[in-house]
């Protein structure tokens, strides 16, 4: 199913994005004012997490010309079905309800997905995930963004895989050409402020 809505029509579904649905019943109108009433995400969080999981191979990708290379998701040949159950443009503060998330999980089960990737923290939805696991679906949840202490990790049900980001032990050297044509190698550091301003 490719559900049509604001900023999203049937042409947005393809051989890569094979389905799209959105859920907003019960979400306050104020929370939806800066959001697309469609499977499209206003803050790119869903796009980011989907590309991390299943992004196609893109040669010569870079960030404003820096750190050029090949970008790809963990499973670049995988197809994506979008079930947008949380809305809201504030980073880390989406608006949704247990009902919208459970409806999305139920639809994903019915549609026969192989993997559910949920980048949200809603502990009470772990039983929806249990139903998916009982149907043979691998369920992967985000651990959250609350810090490094074990007690702040969300989505800890024993039947789901909980993933988190970590610091990496490598740098991204980038060649910079100065006005006098001298080239120097520098380490690239990208901050949230820079990303938000771009």
Question: Where do the model's predicted regions map?
Answer:
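Subtilisin-like serine protease catalytic core
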Residues: 1-96, 111, 134-136, 151, ...
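Catalytic-core segments of hydrolase enzymes
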Residues: 1-6, 109-189
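Generic structural motif recognizing short loop/turn segments at the entrances and edges of beta-strands
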Residues: 13-18, 172-174, 180-182, 196-198
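Extracellular/luminal Protease-associated
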Residues: 36, 95-105, 116-121, 195-198
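Predominantly extracellular/luminal regions of secreted and cell-surface proteins
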Residues: 187-197
